Amino acid sequence: MFKKRTLRSIFVSLMLTALCCLTLVGCSSKSSDELPKLVIGCDNCRPYNYTDEDGKPAGMDVDLAKEACRRMGYEPVFEQIEWNRRDVLLASGKIDCLWSCFSMDGQEDRYAWVGPYMYSRQIVAVLYDSPIRHLSDLEGKSVAVRVGSKAETTFLEHSEEGVPQVQNVYCLSDLSEVITALRNDYVDACAGYAAAVREQLRNAGVEYRFLNEDFARAKLGIAFSKGSDEELRNKLSDALDEMLADGTTARILQAYGVNTDKVLGGEENE
């Protein structure tokens, strides 16, 4: 009798333990599934944002967004978009924000911004054997830029001192198209963020030179639509401030070979 009762007690205890474990796992899974999502619109702008060999989002902006969302209790969802449709997608609510090496300069009143979280140097690149040596040599030439970029604004609106009047400005949907235009001699030069242009040119196997003069410096931020959730923006801003203060932002950027003393202090590394 004692033996049967003992075996029954052990069996009941095991069943209760298993039930508790299943309950805990279920709660944990449910909690993870119920995390609010932050849908981030981005495009191919390596090393800031790109798709790796496994088809997963990667890059400096991706890593920063993942860590910021972890601290906020959000799940980041990265959506590769056509950059020239960014405002339509933002207004429709299909994406919550734009986070992809996006310049705040000249667009301060167009979006509700979080940032700047980083700074970037704007450069002009030419093929290695190009006769173009200085910014002034671009007068009457053709330049390719990424649509929506600081470079686009600069060359279309002549918003920076020392940038000459060029003959044509080709605004292309992503940086890979910009580099292709330069490589195939469709344009005389291309312009954009130094780190991104350098990375794309190297990956494309293009022999290139940067002109000695930088034509601008850009503040990079995360763009939300006007009238969007202010509490969400404040949470993101607080998370980024914490990451900067505790050195997390610097560690993420250093993993990509970035000189953080310059990009976090107002300039980009050479």
Model-predicted regions and their roles:
Residues 85-88, 101-110, 154-157, 181-216:
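A ligand-binding cleft/hinge motif common to bilobed small-molecule-binding domains
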Residues 74, 82, 115-165, 169, ...:
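A conserved helix-loop-strand patch within extracytoplasmic ligand-binding domains
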